[in-house]
């Protein structure tokens, strides 16, 4: 970044500081990952200069013959990965992908069945502080009080009672496999559409290590980062019968020109997801998550649902007599990055919370394996149990530094 360094020292310094943070800390935020240098190169390419309103072959600007090729590559690769009939790779985010689906099939005030945010759902699944909860009549389903797993009988009962036009499956903090086939059966029974938000698990689905929602859902939305390990962005997969409507909902419905440099980066990431080593990577994510969950439980920590089936673990910190906010802060102080998170049947404020959400996608990309998961479990427990002991926290910092120094990040940057 020689040009940036010469031209804008302040921005360069901030970027260098962030690179230093990523190199020196253990990244456990479940929604984050480390992209390849090829993905970064595509996103930083001259495609950032090109306006391309519309779709390949039907643009409102000239000079789109090369970006058309890039977008077609991205769409074709997604179809190959997930078996989708139609794909739109233009959404700038997962939230905008969800918005486009809602705009396609719903009218203001329509009833939708979605997962309670504190039970693992997402803001765009009907939270009252989000457009989805303002524009539509969302009815919430959640998890069982004992098992902390989705209660499908309750979902069916609420679907029969409220007759939603759309049912939303998928989550941002649910560590278990979701039965998409069961959701489709429920949707069919009440005459509803089914949308699956697979943002967190898309990479695991791509590798064939998690059930694929595409055969069961009318619409599937996802981000392109997280376990899929691409640039920050979104996309929509749908049945061919909804293709024109979905495309119109994205453009000109809620977006203008697509970010062609980001779509190029998406295409590169999708190409990576088609390689054999991506399946190995995804399997390592799951193996690491299971090992980390086991280690945390051996240390006496409480896990929501008792473990994990995917990349995500939700820790209930109440038995440590601290809050999620305190846990996030003290872990960050020693070099472990997590996020505070609500837990099912939460009683604390969402700014305080009773839980911490962690994930293994980023550390797996970095090369961490089972032995490192044992050390991370020990570090998390040691830090939280000694959160007011500065000598113990200093010891934890040294252990984090010793661990991260073994796995250099982005050596060419």
From Swiss-Prot:
Give a yes or no for keyword Transferase in this entry.
Answer: yes
| Entry's family note | Belongs to the SHMT family.
Q: Which species is this record about?
A: Bacillus cereus (strain AH187)
What cofactor does this chain's UniProt record say it requires? pyridoxal 5'-phosphate
Which positions bind (6S)-5,6,7,8-tetrahydrofolate? 117, 121-123, 239, 349-351
Q: Name one GO biological process term.
A: glycine biosynthetic process from serine
Q: Which residues carry this modification: N6-(pyridoxal phosphate)lysine?
A: 226
Pfam families reported for this sequence: SHMT (PF00464)
Q: In which pathway does it act?
A: One-carbon metabolism; tetrahydrofolate interconversion; Amino-acid biosynthesis; glycine biosynthesis; glycine from L-serine: step 1/1
Q: Give the matching InterPro entries.
A: PyrdxlP-dep_Trfase (IPR015424), PyrdxlP-dep_Trfase_major (IPR015421), PyrdxlP-dep_Trfase_small (IPR015422), Ser_HO-MeTrfase (IPR001085), Ser_HO-MeTrfase-like (IPR049943), Ser_HO-MeTrfase_PLP_BS (IPR019798), SHMT-like_dom (IPR039429)
Entry's Gene Ontology molecular function annotations:
glycine hydroxymethyltransferase activity; pyridoxal phosphate binding
> So what EC number does this one have?
2.1.2.1
Q: Which reaction does it catalyse?
A: (6R)-5,10-methylene-5,6,7,8-tetrahydrofolate + glycine + H2O = (6S)-5,6,7,8-tetrahydrofolate + L-serine
Sorted alphabetically, the Gene Ontology cellular component annotations on this record are: cytosol
Q: Where is this site: Plays an important role in substrate specificity?
A: 225
List locations, semicolon-separated: Cytoplasm
Q: Its domain of life? A: Bacteria
According to UniProt, the name of this protein is Serine hydroxymethyltransferase
Q: Which UniProt keywords apply?
A: Amino-acid biosynthesis, Cytoplasm, One-carbon metabolism, Pyridoxal phosphate, Transferase
């Amino acid at each position: 970044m020689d040009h940036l360094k010469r031209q804008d020292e302040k921005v360069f310094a901030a970027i260098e500081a962030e690179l230093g943070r990523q190199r020196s800390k253990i990244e456990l935020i479940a929604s984050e990952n480390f992209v390849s240098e090829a993905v970064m190169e595509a996103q930083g390419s001259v495609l950032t200069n090109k306006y391309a309103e519309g779709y390949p072959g039907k643009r409102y600007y000239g000079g789109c013959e090369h970006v058309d090729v890039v977008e077609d590559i991205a769409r074709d690769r997604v179809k190959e990965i997930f078996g989708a009939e139609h794909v739109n790779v233009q959404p700038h985010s997962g939230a905008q992908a969800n918005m486009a689906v809602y705009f396609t099939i719903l009218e203001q005030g329509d009833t939708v069945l979605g997962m309670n945010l504190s039970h693992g759902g997402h803001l765009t699944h009907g939270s009252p502080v989000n457009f989805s909860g303002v524009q539509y009549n969302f009815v919430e389903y959640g998890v069982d009080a004992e098992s902390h797993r989705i209660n499908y009988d309750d979902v069916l009962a609420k679907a029969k009672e409220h007759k939603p036009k759309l049912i939303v499956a998928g989550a941002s903090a649910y560590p278990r496999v979701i039965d998409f086939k069961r959701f489709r059966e429920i949707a069919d029974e009440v005459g509803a559409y089914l949308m699956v938000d697979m943002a967190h698990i898309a990479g695991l689905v791509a590798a064939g290590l998690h059930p694929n929602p595409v055969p069961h859902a009318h619409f599937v939305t996802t981000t392109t980062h997280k376990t899929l390990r691409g640039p920050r962005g979104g996309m929509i997969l749908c049945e061919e019968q909804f293709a024109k409507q979905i495309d119109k909902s994205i453009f000109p419905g809620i977006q203008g020109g697509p970010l062609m440099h980001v779509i190029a980066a998406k295409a590169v990431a999708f190409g990576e997801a088609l390689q054999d080593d991506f399946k190995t990577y995804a399997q390592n994510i799951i193996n690491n998550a299971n090992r980390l969950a086991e280690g945390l439980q051996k240390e006496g920590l409480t896990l929501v649902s008792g473990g994990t089936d995917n990349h995500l673990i939700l820790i209930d910190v109440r038995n440590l007599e601290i809050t999620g906010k305190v846990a996030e802060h003290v872990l960050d102080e020693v070099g472990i990055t997590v996020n505070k998170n609500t837990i099912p049947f939460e009683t604390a404020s969402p700014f305080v919370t009773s839980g911490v959400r962690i994930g293994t996608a980023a550390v797996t990309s970095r090369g961490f394996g089972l032995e490192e998961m044992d050390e991370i479990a020990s570090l998390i427990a040691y830090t939280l149990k000694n959160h007011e002991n500065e000598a113990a926290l200093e010891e934890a910092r040294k252990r984090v530094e010793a661990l991260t120094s073994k796995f250099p990040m982005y050596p060419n940057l």
